UniProtKB/Swiss-Prot annotation:
Entry protein name: Heat shock protein 90 homolog
Written domain comment of the UniProt record: The TPR repeat-binding motif mediates interaction with TPR repeat-containing proteins.
NCBIfam families found in the cross-reference section: PRK05218.1
Organism: Schizosaccharomyces pombe (strain 972 / ATCC 24843) (Fission yeast)
Gene it is expressed from: swo1
Chief location of this protein within or outside the cell: cytoplasm
Length: 704
């Protein structure tokens, strides 16, 4: 065929097809769901195009999906009257250009994900090879001729100008040449069951071409005539009777005839137009799966209508788990399908729902929006803003309903707590409502998640604030020296160990009148009695000179050295400034590949070195300073090691780990009575080098 061109599959698509062909996955019926879903998308596109171009439907006015099983030739055909594909579309979409989801799906499959997830990655077409050895795609676009794409998945495909086949007028027909062990999908019952299970709520008619054998009564005229002719010569002449008796004697017989007809499989009207009380759990589950291509049931559903000045209906679903690409920049910002008076408009409308609710899936059908909506109109439309506000409120209602069931809420929180915290960071209007949904482990509840409301209820009467600590992990914060005083006072402290917590608490300043206080920052004022205050002031005076000496040794590494009332057992710790980054935030920002380094210089807080006067180590070091002075080499080494150890225990990282290791090695040598001269000389840390090393940090002082 001179009009045939051969192309090679892009490497990733070849690998994907090989994975599908060789899979031992038993639930192969999902191929039909994927192909029907693609057909529905193609119909959505032509219907949307027809809103601005009335002639788009001229070639074929009816919009439908038709399934035709051909048992004789072992071919299953799925046809739609959608937008169709041009020659270039067939080449690019079905073989040459790999979609971003191709690689993601293969990675997910390699790590044990269910193959029925294929539709979520935009590569559902290739599921056809679960049941077919060869696939043909015949397509006719309004702007091009009719072409046939064909491949047996051997690494290449052909595209041919179709001059001989039946005319499609417009749309696409996929012909699956079925594998010998998959012929059950040519059976009427199997097709009906599969469509009901996966695609019952598709918005377009799904027709099944069925063959029926019907019995028909026909007169035995022909047979009688033949017998008559044969015996005409032999038989004697019989006297003719009148017409009436002749009619009585005429006989009929029953013959079987094969007829072909189309049967509509999805007559159920759109589920969102029905009264919520009439819809069963099974129907919601079926609709959710057909809408999202998920193989699991949803976690929660909210089905409602809004009437009055503005009218719309909606169904919103919370999935059981977060998609793998939930926070990827290129991902669609939401999963809500927007309809206007049952006409599909778009499923990529960023204005419909905020980004932090990007995991919500569902349908919104408005009575008031114009049908010919452009992206610009969507952005500026006041109705959209009202719909958005309503959707957010209903989502919050749904989350509160989930929270009533502890087990369900744990599933929800494990999957979507980051979204709630992103909402707290971005959505000022709903911040108080979102804060009620937050859950944390804490000092007094290390194994249970508690809410902020729970925390306040259990607060002692004299406690004024909500205390929290941020860190890399629960284990890291549980052993933090910052908690020592809180254990002693029996105050609870929330453990915030998700990196996004740092961003959320910068916006969530208080909850129900109680201020949220980070215990790793300076300026922490703990409630104390007059006696405790007098004892603290006495110790501050006693250690004032020692604190000055330590500041001299550490130089610009710290802003100040103070006597602490926060430490019970540890010798010292480091706190950060009120308005700069915490140790945990500093760690997070250092891990950002595209961070603004100039910002780091200002936001990396000046550190306060807090010493515990009741610690034997601090008391002994104070004596050593008084005896030998601040210039003594061992005093400098000990002070620096204390500082670096405090850095680590307070959640910071060391700028020069090798120098720290050398100092520790020197201490080990002393402990083992190894002669110092046997050791390689260790360069002393001068206050000048410390100043140079921390020049960037000093900028913070200028800003303050």
């Amino acid at each position: 065929m001179s009009n045939t061109e051969t192309f090679k599959f892009e490497a990733e698509i070849s690998q994907l097809m090989s994975l599908i062909i060789n899979t031992v996955y038993s639930n192969k019926e999902i191929f039909l769901r994927e192909l029907i879903s693609n057909a529905s998308d193609a119909l959505d596109k032509i219907r949307y195009q027809s809103l601005s171009d009335p002639h788009a439907l001229d070639a074929e006015k009816d919009l439908f999906i038709r399934i035709t099983p051909d048992k004789e030739n072992k071919i299953l055909s799925i046809r739609d009257t959608g937008i169709g594909m041009t020659k270039n579309d067939l080449i690019n979409n079905l073989g040459v250009i790999a979609k971003s989801g191709t690689k993601q799906f293969m990675e997910a499959a390699a790590s044990g994900a269910d193959i029925s997830m294929i539709g979520q990655f935009g590569v559902g077409f290739y599921s056809a090879y679960l049941v077919a050895d060869k696939v043909q795609v015949v397509s006719k676009h309004n702007d091009d001729e009719q072409y046939i794409w064909e491949s047996s998945a051997g690494g290449s495909f052909t595209v041919t100008l179709d001059t001989d086949g039946p005319r499609l007028l417009r749309g696409t027909e996929i012909r699956l040449f079925m594998k010998e062990d998959q012929l059950q999908y040519l059976e009427e019952k199997t097709i009906k069951d599969t469509v009901k299970k996966h695609s019952e709520f598709i918005s377009y008619p799904i027709q099944l071409v069925v063959t029926r054998e019907v019995e028909k009564e026909v007169p035995e005229e022909e047979e009688t005539e033949e017998v008559k002719n044969e015996e005409d010569d032999k038989a004697p002449k019989i006297e003719e009777v009148d017409d009436e008796s002749e009619k009585k004697e005429k006989k009929t017989k029953k013959v079987k005839e094969t007829t072909t007809e189309t049967e509509e499989l999805n007559k159920t009207k759109p589920i969102w137009t029905r009264n919520p009380s009439e819809v069963t759990k099974e129907e919601y589950a079926s609709f959710y799966k057909s809408l999202t291509n998920d193989w699991e049931d949803h976690l929660a559903v909210k089905h409602f209508s809004v009437e009055g000045q503005l009218e719309f209906r909606a169904i919103l679903f919370v999935p059981r788990r977060a998609p793998m690409d939930l926070f990827e920049a290129k991902r669609k910002k939401n999963n809500i399908k927007l309809y206007v008076r049952r006409v599909f408009i778009t499923d990529d409308c960023e204005e419909l729902i905020p980004e932090w609710l990007g995991f919500i899936k569902g349908v919104v059908d408005s009575e008031d929006l114009p049908l010919n909506l452009s992206r610009e109109m969507l952005q500026q439309n006041k109705i959209m803003k009202v719909i958005r506000k309503n959707l957010v409120r209903r989502c919050l209602d749904m989350f509160n309903e989930i929270a009533e069931d502890k087990e369900n809420f744990k599933t929800f929180y494990d999957a979507f707590s980051k979204n709630l915290k992103l909402g707290i960071h971005e959505d000022a209007a709903n911040r108080p409502a979102l804060a009620k949904l937050l859950r944390y482990n804490s000092l007094n509840s290390p194994d249970d998640l508690i809410s902020l409301e729970d925390y306040i209820t259990k607060m002692p009467e004299h406690q004024k604030n909500i205390y929290f600590i941020t860190g890399e992990s629960k284990q890291a914060v549980e052993n933090s020296p910052f908690l020592e005083i809180f254990r002693a006072k029996k105050f609870d402290v929330l453990f915030m160990v998700d990196p996004i917590d740092e961003y959320a608490v910068t916006q969530l300043k208080e909850f129900e009148g109680k201020k949220l206080v980070n215990i790793t920052k300076d300026g922490l004022e703990l409630e104390e009695t007059d006696e405790e205050k007098a004892a603290r002031e006495k110790l501050e005076k006693e250690y004032e000179e020692f604190a000055k000496q330590l500041k001299t040794i550490l130089g610009d590494k710290v802003e100040k050295v103070v006597v602490s009332n926060k430490i019970v057992g540890s010798p010292c710790l480091l706190t950060t400034g009120q308005y700069g980054w915490s140790a945990n935030m500093e760690r997070i920002m250092k891990a950002q590949a595209l961070r603004d380094t100039s910002m780091s210089a200002y936001m990396s807080s000046r550190k306060t070195f807090e010493i515990n006067p009741k610690s034997p180590i601090i008391a002994e070091l104070k004596k050593k300073v008084e005896e030998n002075g601040a210039e003594d080499r061992s005093v400098k080494d000990l002070a620096t090691i204390l500082y670096e150890t405090a850095l680590l225990s307070s959640g910071f990282t060391l700028d020069d780990p090798s120098a720290y290791a050398q100092r520790i090695n020197r201490l080990i040598s002393l402990g083992l009575s190894i002669d110092e001269e046997e050791e390689a000389p260790i360069e002393e840390i001068s206050t000048e080098s410390v100043a140079a090393e921390n020049n960037a940090e000093s900028k913070m002082e200028e800003v303050d």
